[in-house]
From Swiss-Prot:
GO terms for cellular component: extracellular region. This is 34 kDa cell wall protein. It comes from Nicotiana tabacum (Common tobacco). It is found in: Secreted, Cell wall. Its main location: secreted. Keywords: Cell wall, Secreted.
Length: 15
């Protein structure tokens, strides 16, 4: 569960 990756996607909307 890559937090950083998921968090970035959720916050950036899957940049």
């Amino acid at each position: 569960w890559p937090x950083a990756q998921i968090f970035s996607a959720v916050r950036g909307x899957v940049n």
